């Protein structure tokens, strides 16, 4: 067997370290093989054992999540999660990160993040119908932030718009904690038939392995390894590890894949994502309990002279690997030719249980699959309990000295300001099934199931400052807010995907954040019957030893049996009464008010009472079904004040809040207590009576009408001033000349 595919003068142990393998891990490789690996084999082991592919530091924590439910068809372990929405239909969805690539090369990093998550979904037989994104950028004053925002947003828009899938929801935050490591989490939702789901396990030996899609180039080599390491000042030199996307090729790939599936020729299928051809071939064979032999000479190549090492580790985009049923190769050939895709039979499944690669007539890799697929190192890393912040007494937190100025500053700060500049670049209505999106005043994006009266609601949520202050409560809150947003839109929450973004798990403090945040998430999922069906873990998000704020992002999916019963907060009318549903203690710890007005980032986050969360949410869904409400908005960042301002802006109507009777008006208006909703109704007596009967706290909070946003005796700003403050920041920031 050839000992090398790409010549190297360095000892293998030194190369292993450069590839991200620890000395102890390399020793395990030697033990598994009984010899020293060659460069191709070392590359294969390094990417499959990377954090990005193996989940070696997080797998033990992920076992805590509930993954089953009456609607779950397929949970974690496949390319995406699958849930049954009735009438023979299924929703397939997943969220995934492209953090490191997007920091190094923002346009391509973000664009290929969108492309990659779509492939995870259509690989399982679904047509993508919605995209979401959760973006975290550094402080606006940081010299790189504006360029990163511009590139990431353009990349998301450029890819999603060209493929023709609407971007319907998302969230965007700014904080200095992301200065050296931004987060780009992309989510895709697809629609499939429940009896036509495709999986990745190769069903037996002797079957043709077909490569189709774009040619393989040298872009993205060791991308998975790069995404499993922390950054330094030299990280921008890693641009060659960032993949380059072609959305038009992706569109062709979607159509060809779905057409191929419809012929019945597909036995197993897998997209080529992180670790490229290595990961796809190893996973298909490993899950099926078979071996696989590939002839690298047959791989379609974009560049001349590529080695087997380069072809196996390339992360060139828009590529698929399929195992076809016996004798069906010609069916595939005709479809690939129709759609203008490169394609070739590059190998066969075997009964050896080994990964064998041949190139130019030589065997350049011959290793057992088991250590690659299901025997990667698994770590139960040491951790320490995160230091927690004390609860802030509302009486000890100063009220604004100038309420009008405070209102405008809060509503216009980077996190609260309108993101219109951003989402107007996304095509939100392509496919013509979007009912609610970022522009309409709704707590979730809503997309109808074409040809039915049903719709799905989708949302993305996390409050990193809560997780920083208390990972356990912050983890609970991320799940609870997703559940609450879907409820406020009129949907029944069904399941979640997640994207766990943290620093280095080798640091006990960071590992403590991971452990406690996932504890909280798991508890919330169980209490709310909100199973985790897919997800992604992104670790080593730190630069020069400084970690990002812990950011476990949750993507939630809910079902509306009748989309005419959807709710938002953009149609509140003159004279509607605003009823606050849920209990208010005035929790100001880790709040927007504390940070933006008082310049503080301290205090315990609002605790999440999951029993109360469920009771209140179930009550609100019942109210929506009864037809008593004109609008619903959940309370989160900025509390009642921001929720009411959102209503005023979306409905283009004034709002007057009643707060003068409160002991601590600033805590009542700006506290961020959980399990609360703002209900607009023409019949407040009926709502209050229903709440009393259900044992749910509710009180009249204000009234809609006029042309001002006000609270008697505290503040009054015109709608025009409120809108100007809300809309001004982001376009002003992006258009300002460099300092």
Curated annotation (Swiss-Prot):
Keywords: ATP-binding, Cytoplasm, Ligase, Magnesium, Metal-binding, Nucleotide-binding, Purine biosynthesis. The keyword Oxidoreductase does not apply. Mg(2+) 2 binds at residues 120, 271. It comes from the Bacteria. Pathway: Purine metabolism; IMP biosynthesis via de novo pathway; 5-amino-1-(5-phospho-D-ribosyl)imidazole from N(2)-formyl-N(1)-(5-phospho-D-ribosyl)glycinamide: step 1/2. Its EC number is 6.3.5.3. Signal peptide: none annotated. One of its GO terms (biological process) is 'de novo' IMP biosynthetic process. It is an enzyme of class 6 (ligase). It catalyses: N(2)-formyl-N(1)-(5-phospho-beta-D-ribosyl)glycinamide + L-glutamine + ATP + H2O = 2-formamido-N(1)-(5-O-phospho-beta-D-ribosyl)acetamidine + L-glutamate + ADP + phosphate + H(+). The active site is at 52, 98 (proton acceptor). ATP binds at residues 55, 94, 498, 535. One of its GO terms (cellular component) is cytoplasm. It holds the Pfam family AIRS_C. GO terms for molecular function: ATP binding; magnesium ion binding; phosphoribosylformylglycinamidine synthase activity. Transmembrane segments: none annotated. InterPro entries: PRibForGlyAmidine_synth_PurL, PurL_linker, PurM-like_C_dom, PurM-like_C_sf, PurM-like_N, PurM-like_N_sf. Mg(2+) 1 binds at residues 96, 536. PANTHER family: PHOSPHORIBOSYLFORMYLGLYCINAMIDINE SYNTHASE SUBUNIT PURL (PTHR43555:SF1). Belongs to the FGAMS family. Part of the phosphoribosylformylglycinamidine synthase complex involved in the purines biosynthetic pathway. Catalyzes the ATP-dependent conversion of formylglycinamide ribonucleotide (FGAR) and glutamine to yield formylglycinamidine ribonucleotide (FGAM) and glutamate. The FGAM synthase complex is composed of three subunits. PurQ produces an ammonia molecule by converting glutamine to glutamate. PurL transfers the ammonia molecule to FGAR to form FGAM in an ATP-dependent manner. Monomer. Part of the FGAM synthase complex composed of 1 PurL, 1 PurQ and 2 PurS subunits. This is Phosphoribosylformylglycinamidine synthase subunit PurL. It comes from Caulobacter vibrioides (strain ATCC 19089 / CIP 103742 / CB 15) (Caulobacter crescentus). The gene is purL.
């Amino acid at each position: 067997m050839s000992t090398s595919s790409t010549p190297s003068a360095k000892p293998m142990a030194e190369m292993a370290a450069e590839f991200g393998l620890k000395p102890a891990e390399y020793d395990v490789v030697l033990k598994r093989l009984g010899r020293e690996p060659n460069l191709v084999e070392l590359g294969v082991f390094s990417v499959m054992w990377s954090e990005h592919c193996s989940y070696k530091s997080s797998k033990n924590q992920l076992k805590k999540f509930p993954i089953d439910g009456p609607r779950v068809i397929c949970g974690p372990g496949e390319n995406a999660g699958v849930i049954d929405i009735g009438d023979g239909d299924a929703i397939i969805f997943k969220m995934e990160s492209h953090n490191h690539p997007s920091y190094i090369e923002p346009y391509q990093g973000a664009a290929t993040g969108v492309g990659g998550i779509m492939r995870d979904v259509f690989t399982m037989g679904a047509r993508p119908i919605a995209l979401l994104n959760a973006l975290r950028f550094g402080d606006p004053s940081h010299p790189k932030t504006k360029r990163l925002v511009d590139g990431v947003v353009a990349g998301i828009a450029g890819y999603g718009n060209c493929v023709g899938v609407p971007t319907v929801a998302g969230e965007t935050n700014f904080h200095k904690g992301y200065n050296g490591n931004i987060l780009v989490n992309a989510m895709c939702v697809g629609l499939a038939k429940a009896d036509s789901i495709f999986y990745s396990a190769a069903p037996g030996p002797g079957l043709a392995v077909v490569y189709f899609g774009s040619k393989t180039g040298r872009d993205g080599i060791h991308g998975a390894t790069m995404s499993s390491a922390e950054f330094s000042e030299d990280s921008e030199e890693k641009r060659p590890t960032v993949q380059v996307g072609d959305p038009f090729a992706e569109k062709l790939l979607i159509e060809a894949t779905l057409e191929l599936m419809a012929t019945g020729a597909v036995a197993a299928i897998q997209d080529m994502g992180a670790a490229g051809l290595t990961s796809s071939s190893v996973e298909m064979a490993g899950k099926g309990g078979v071996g696989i032999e590939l002839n690298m000479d047959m791989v379609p190549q974009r560049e001349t002279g590529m080695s087997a090492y380069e072809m196996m580790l390339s992360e060139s985009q828009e590529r698929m690997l399929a195992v076809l049923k016996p004798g069906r190769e010609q069916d595939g050939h005709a479809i690939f030719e129709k759609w203008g895709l490169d394609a070739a039979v590059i190998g066969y499944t075997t009964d050896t249980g080994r990964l064998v690669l041949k190139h130019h007539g030589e065997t350049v890799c011959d290793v057992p699959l088991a250590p690659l697929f299901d025997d990667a190192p698994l770590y139960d890393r040491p951790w320490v309990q995160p230091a927690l912040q004390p609860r802030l007494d509302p009486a000890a937190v100063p009220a604004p000295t100038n309420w009008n100025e405070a209102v405008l500053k809060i509503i216009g700060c980077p996190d609260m300001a309108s993101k219109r500049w951003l989402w107007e670049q996304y095509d939100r209505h392509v496919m013509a099934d979007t009912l609610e999106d970022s522009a309409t005043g709704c707590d979730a994006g809503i997309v109808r199931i074409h040809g039915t009266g049903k719709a799905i609601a989708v949302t993305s949520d996390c409050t990193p400052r809560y997780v920083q202050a208390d990972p356990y409560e912050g983890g609970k809150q991320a799940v609870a807010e997703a559940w609450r947003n879907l409820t406020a839109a009129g949907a029944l929450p069904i399941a979640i995907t997640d994207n766990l973004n943290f620093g280095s798990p080798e640091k006990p403090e960071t590992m403590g954040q991971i452990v406690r945040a996932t504890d909280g998430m798991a508890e919330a999922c169980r209490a709310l019957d909100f199973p985790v069906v897919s997800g992604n873990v992104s670790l080593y998000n730190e630069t020069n030893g400084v970690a990002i704020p812990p950011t476990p992002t949750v993507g939630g999916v809910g079902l509306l049996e009748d989309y005419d019963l959807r709710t938002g907060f953009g149609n509140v009318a003159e004279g509607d009464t605003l009823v606050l549903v849920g209990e208010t203690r005035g929790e100001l710890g880790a709040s927007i008010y504390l940070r933006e007005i008082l310049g503080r980032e301290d205090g315990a986050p609002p605790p999440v009472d999951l029993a109360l969360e469920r009771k209140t949410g179930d009550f609100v869904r019942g109210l929506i079904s009864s037809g008593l409400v004109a609008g619903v908005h959940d309370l989160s960042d900025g509390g009642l004040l921001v929720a009411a301002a959102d209503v005023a802006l979306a409905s283009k109507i004034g709002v007057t809040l009643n707060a003068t009777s409160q002991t601590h008006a600033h805590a009542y208006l700006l506290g961020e207590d959980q399990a609360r909703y703002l209900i607009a109704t023409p019949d407040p007596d009926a709502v209050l009576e229903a709440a009393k009967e259900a044992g749910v706290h509710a009180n009249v909070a204000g009234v809609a009408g006029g042309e001002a946003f006000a609270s008697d005796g505290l503040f009054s700003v015109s709608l025009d001033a409120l809108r100007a403050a809300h809309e001004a920041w982001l376009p002003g920031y992006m258009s300002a000349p460099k300092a």
